[in-house]
């Protein structure tokens, strides 16, 4: 599966079309016409600094979404693999502009979460949702 490309649920949001990433632009990636939309692909994130696999097949689904603009491990993997970084939230956990119908909404508010879940279901992106406790929260 490594190398497979795919489209993602929020590719219609303006931030995904920003060459080089958003809100911080990587000029090298921009010059290669790379943006969030063009960079969705299955990767092998490799190992952490202790030599352990970052994604383990026996935990959860064995498939993890990497978001280089969101979180330390994802950022490090994205930097290593030279991927576009999209950081959707400001310092108040609100979606910044260029995120369409989500702009200005607080990511942790129940109403925002419910809207996102409804969007995923209405667009047949998710039919059932549950929670998987990440291994880094053990």
What are these regions (language model features)?
Residues 1-63, 72, 76:
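Protease-associated
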Residues 48-138:
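Residue patterns forming the tRNA-binding/recognition surfaces of aminoacyl-tRNA synthetases
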């Amino acid at each position: 599966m490594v190398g497979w490309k795919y489209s993602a649920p929020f590719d219609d949001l303006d931030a995904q079309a920003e060459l080089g990433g958003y809100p911080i632009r990587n000029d090298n990636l921009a010059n290669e016409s790379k943006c969030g939309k063009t960079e969705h692909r299955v990767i092998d994130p490799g190992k952490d600094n202790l030599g352990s696999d970052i994604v383990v097949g026996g935990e959860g689904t064995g498939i993890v979404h990497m978001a280089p603009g969101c979180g330390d491990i994802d950022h490090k993997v994205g930097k290593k693999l030279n991927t576009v970084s999209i950081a959707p939230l400001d310092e108040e956990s609100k979606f910044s502009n260029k995120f369409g119908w989500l702009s200005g909404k607080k990511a942790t508010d129940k109403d925002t979460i419910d809207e996102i879940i409804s969007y995923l279901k209405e667009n047949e992106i998710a039919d059932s949702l549950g929670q998987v406790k990440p291994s880094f929260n053990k």
